[in-house]
């Protein structure tokens, strides 16, 4: 898609695009505003329904639009009953912020969501393209929810009320200062955090957690096993009794049951580094599916970050547990919602 950067190009593209997308019988006319009118908008869009009813929206053209910019400008973006923002590109995060604020948006030649009184039109087909790790622009990380960047995200969610310096986060995650700095810049760009005089604070923990849960799952190996024990609680007692030098952490329904009991669970899932060691310790038998034990060997060792004990059993961090439950869907996702509603996700 051609990147339009001038107001004139954006205006002409909007006018042409509306002619193609408006329902039959609808008409639209754009009128630019002068400096003496309202300096906060670039024009007014008049929409005429087939019934003759007219509605208006203030139009704002942006050559560049980042989520952090939207957060700063929301007070005047929502000043009018209806507003329409037009920009050559909009990230998923930018669109989400505008949707939540009730602001319509339009990407020339791409997607749009316009809700102005009796008119609602939407096109959501284009997938945002992720920048490859080798792309020239290295001010930001390519993916917040993979690799080292996810370790930063995870710690922000584990301690959402804490103020972090770059050095603090680098020490906690074991990442370089430069990589941590780029990750925090990306989070600030996407309006998840605020950075003031070297201090970083999480400002939208719910949106960050939900975006992580919706991101693709990392590649990891899950091994189905059967343990000949009398129920999952007996299995947890065996796990608790086993001494191992390598880290492990229980996740999914078995872990959620320790924090916010929701429903009976029949199997135990756990992150481990030594699969063979656990096979021997618990006398596990390999099965293709339907086991009562699942040993997950993660590619990302960050799944162990922030793990804690409950009833003598190490559990993965609360944010990691929530994401794991949501991604499993079904009853597990319901358990995640229950955990959040009960305040077990971020206890006071």
Regions found by a protein language model. Name each.
Residues 278-348:
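Hydrophobic alpha-helical interaction segments
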Residues 1-35:
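Acidic-basic catalytic patches of nuclease active cores, encompassing PD-(D/E)XK
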Residues 219-302:
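Short gly/ser-rich loop at a beta-strand->alpha-helix junction or flexible surface loop bordering the NTP-binding
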Residues 39-79, 83-86, 322:
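Conserved catalytic cores of phosphodiester-cleaving nucleases, focusing on short active-site segments
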Residues 79-106:
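Nucleic-acid nuclease catalytic cores
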Residues 122-151:
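Short alpha-helical segments that sit at the start of domains
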Residues 196-223, 227-234:
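Extended amphipathic alpha-helical segments with heptad-repeat/coiled-coil character used for oligomerization
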Residues 149-211:
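Loop-centered beta-sheet repeat module
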């Amino acid at each position: 898609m051609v990147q339009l950067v001038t107001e004139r190009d954006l205006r002409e593209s909007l006018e042409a695009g509306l002619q193609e997308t408006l329902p039959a019988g609808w008409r639209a006319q754009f009128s630019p505003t002068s400096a003496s009118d309202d300096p906060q908008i670039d024009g007014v869009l008049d929409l005429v329904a087939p019934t003759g009813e007219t509605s208006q929206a203030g139009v704002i053209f942006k050559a560049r639009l980042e989520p952090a910019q939207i957060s700063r400008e929301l007070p005047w973006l929502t000043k009018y009953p209806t507003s329409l923002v037009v920009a050559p590109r909009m990230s998923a995060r930018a669109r989400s912020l505008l949707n939540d604020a009730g602001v319509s948006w339009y990407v020339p030649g791409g997607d749009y969501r316009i809700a102005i009184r009796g008119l609602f039109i939407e096109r959501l087909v284009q997938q945002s393209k992720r920048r490859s790790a080798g792309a020239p622009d290295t001010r930001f990380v390519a993916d917040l929810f993979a690799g080292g960047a996810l370790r930063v995200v995870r710690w922000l969610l584990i301690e959402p009320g804490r103020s972090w310096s770059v050095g603090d986060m680098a020490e906690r995650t074991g990442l370089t200062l430069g990589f941590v700095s780029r990750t925090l810049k990306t989070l600030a760009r996407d309006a998840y955090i605020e950075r003031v005089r070297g201090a970083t604070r999480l400002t939208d923990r719910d949106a960050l957690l939900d975006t992580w849960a919706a991101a693709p799952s990392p590649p990891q190996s899950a091994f189905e096993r059967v343990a000949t024990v009398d129920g999952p609680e007996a299995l947890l007692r065996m796990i608790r009794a086993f001494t191992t030098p390598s880290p492990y952490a229980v996740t999914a329904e078995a872990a959620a049951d320790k924090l916010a009991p929701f429903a009976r669970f029949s199997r135990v899932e756990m992150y481990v580094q030594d699969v063979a060691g656990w096979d021997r310790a618990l006398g596990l038998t390999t099965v293709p599916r339907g086991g009562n034990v699942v040993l997950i060997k993660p590619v990302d060792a960050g799944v162990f970050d922030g793990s804690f004990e409950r009833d003598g059993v190490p559990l993965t961090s609360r944010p990691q547990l929530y994401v794991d439950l949501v991604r499993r869907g079904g009853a597990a996702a319901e358990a995640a919602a229950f955990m959040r509603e009960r305040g077990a996700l971020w206890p006071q």
